[in-house]
């Protein structure tokens, strides 16, 4: 049997072996949206029943850019998906004070908190990079604490962070794709797929990330499974009734026993 070499993913050699391979067995469940019989939802049970959790602010988070562990996955700024996403961000910014946002003066200054960058061959808005990372990222030493100013403010206001952050930020590391599918009888349905936003989700640049959390056992230490810890986000992506159906499916699958357990969750040990 031929043994294929492990792909380095652009990491330092000292980090090799820490992340599991990208390709492994997954279990999927499909169900129809209770509110729309022409909407099929395909869900990755291997990911949703994993114990991944965000480890930002701990030694386990090594950052996607070498030498910048305190950035987490915020080094590159966030592309805005559409006009609504930008309007929501603008509203969120109005709620931030100097005590919330380390770079508020810069963000509200002449250069602003957004800049144009290329995505898929087009110029699109993204949050501005300032001193090597997203301008909304509070750095070590800031009295208000490190991390996303928008996320922290949402917690202070006792609202879900997804209500204040750009879409790409609160969805990560959930990946939702949608496509119209032709059925054999000529009818069409909308198919939504929910899965892990792994390195490949970042496109060609994903292979060059210094480190990425979803494949590292050190990030699979959550007390709750992803379908539970990301309940608000999944509800926003699918709708309340569809999420309730998904939750029922996850509970049932967990009770029966998952065959294709996420290898990073396995490597992390008992939960």
What feature does the model see in each segment?
Residues 1-271:
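Short loop/turn segments that flank or connect secondary-structure elements
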